[in-house]
């Protein structure tokens, strides 16, 4: 674990809510803030530099940072929060927000942070019972990321922002016809709850789990989706089960897109700089395929939240205000957590944004007009959508259970959560 120092204020934008935001730290009591986040190296390094800058400006504040990949992050944080040992500040995904807020594990953040330059709808995603408990860090859009270099060399029709699911599957078939035997076109999404969510939303059938906690996986649509991937697996368009099982999203070595096993995968705009950093200029972002409706949506990339058990709520709040509103911080962080939430900060950054950054900005612009309404998800269902669904899907991939039997298991498992 690394220990850094931290602090508050650089070139800041907006109007202060309280005078304490720019106070000198001279004579103030030393504070060490535990802070934790997930991501790749392209997020870790700028974040550590930002913490160093904060401490330089506020010498009384130092940091005890922890950072990791996404795998295992949520489980570890949940365990810490349950034992009242959560970090003072932690990165939180929207899918878990309602659970943390309903368990009174988050400190209220309604004052001390300048929010006037942030879209009201985006701020609403961090509210619970009309109170602000989490601060969005980036505008984000669902996406597909593909290897543009390889697709161009294959000479096939590339993905587009207006493509349908039929065109997506045909893209996979066309690509596989020109790929080597040990290379595949599409990732097998049989066990991917998020990918299926896009598919069902695009059919106009709503989210697989409703906001009020009801099972809503349409049987006909789900079997259509699962059987499509079974056919693609048989044709070698998606990898065999044993290769699919090795995939770890965002991992530099095990992500099947990174290691050139597949050409395309579901992703998020906020993740794109991580892909681009490993292979600059190779990847391209496009919208999720559509059905009768769009399949994609806009969402906050992630939140900063403060533990309800922190002894340093005021300093944690000051840091978050600085993180989202300070121009010097923005110069370091750029789009490592998605397109900046502050409209003022985004305009400040525009002249220095690189191609990978601008792809995120353009993706958000393209997704917005027909975006599906994003569902926070019902509280208490994260284990079902993150683990149970994945486990059942993997049994289908390995041929241990038929799609029809798998659907029955999904229904049975859901009764434990309804």
Pin down the residues of each PLM region:
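Hinge/lid segment of periplasmic solute-binding proteins
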Residues: 93-143, 284-286, 353, 365
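Extracytoplasmic/periplasmic substrate-recognition and gating elements
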Residues: 56, 64, 154, 237, ...
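Glycine-centered hinge/linker elements that transmit conformational signals in sensory
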Residues: 214-246
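Mature extracytoplasmic/periplasmic domains
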Residues: 106, 273, 302, 306-383
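Extracytoplasmic/periplasmic solute-binding protein
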Residues: 133-137, 142, 167-221, 262
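Short, low-complexity disordered leader/linker segments with a strong preference
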Residues: 1-33, 56, 408, 412-418
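C-terminal capping/gating helix-and-loop segments adjacent to ligand/active sites or protein-protein/ligand interfaces
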Residues: 359-414, 418
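Extracytoplasmic "Venus flytrap"/periplasmic binding protein-like
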Residues: 52-120, 153-155, 254-264, 341-343, ...
């Amino acid at each position: 674990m690394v220990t850094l120092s931290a602090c508050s204020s650089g070139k800041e934008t907006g109007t202060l809510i309280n005078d304490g935001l720019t106070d000198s730290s001279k004579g103030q009591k030393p504070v060490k803030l535990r802070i934790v986040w997930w991501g790749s190296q392209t997020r870790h390094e700028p974040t550590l530099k930002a913490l160093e800058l904060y401490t330089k400006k506020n010498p009384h504040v130092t940091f005890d940072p922890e950072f990791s990949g996404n795998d295992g992050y949520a489980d570890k944080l949940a365990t810490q929060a349950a034992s009242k040992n959560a970090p003072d500040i932690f990165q939180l995904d929207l899918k878990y927000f309602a659970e943390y807020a309903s368990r009174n594990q988050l400190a209220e953040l309604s004052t001390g942070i300048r929010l006037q330059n942030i879209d009201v709808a985006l701020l609403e995603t961090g509210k619970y019972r009309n109170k602000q408990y989490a601060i969005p860090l980036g505008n984000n859009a669902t996406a597909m990321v593909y290897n543009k270099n390889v697709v161009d060399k294959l000479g096939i029709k590339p993905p587009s922002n207006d493509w349908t699911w039929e065109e997506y599957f045909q893209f996979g078939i066309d690509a596989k016809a020109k790929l080597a035997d040990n290379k595949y076109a599409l990732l097998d999404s049989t066990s991917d709850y998020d990918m299926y969510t896009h598919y069902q939303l695009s059919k106009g059938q709503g989210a697989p789990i409703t906001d009020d906690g009801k099972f809503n996986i349409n049987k006909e649509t789900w079997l259509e989706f699962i059987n499509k991937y079974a056919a693609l697996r048989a044709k070698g368009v998606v990898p065999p089960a044993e290769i699919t099982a090795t995939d770890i999203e965002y991992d530099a070595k095990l992500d099947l897109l990174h290691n050139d096993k597949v050409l395309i995968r579901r992703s998020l705009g906020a993740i794109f700089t991580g892909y681009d950093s490993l292979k600059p200029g190779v990847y391209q972002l496009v919208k999720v395929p559509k059905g009768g409706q769009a399949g994609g949506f806009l969402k906050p990339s992630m939140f900063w939240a403060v533990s309800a058990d922190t002894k340093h709520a005021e300093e944690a709040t000051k840091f978050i205000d600085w993180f989202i509103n300070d121009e010097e911080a923005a110069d370091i962080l750029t789009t490592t957590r998605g397109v900046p939430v502050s409209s003022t900060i985004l305009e400040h950054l525009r002249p220095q944004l690189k191609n990978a950054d601008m792809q995120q900005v353009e993706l958000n612009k393209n997704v917005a007009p027909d975006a599906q309404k994003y569902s926070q998800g019902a509280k208490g269902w994260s284990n079902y959508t993150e683990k149970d669904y994945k486990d059942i899907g993997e049994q289908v991939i390995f041929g241990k259970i038929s799609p029809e039997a798998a659907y029955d298991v999904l229904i049975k498992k859901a009764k434990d959560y309804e």
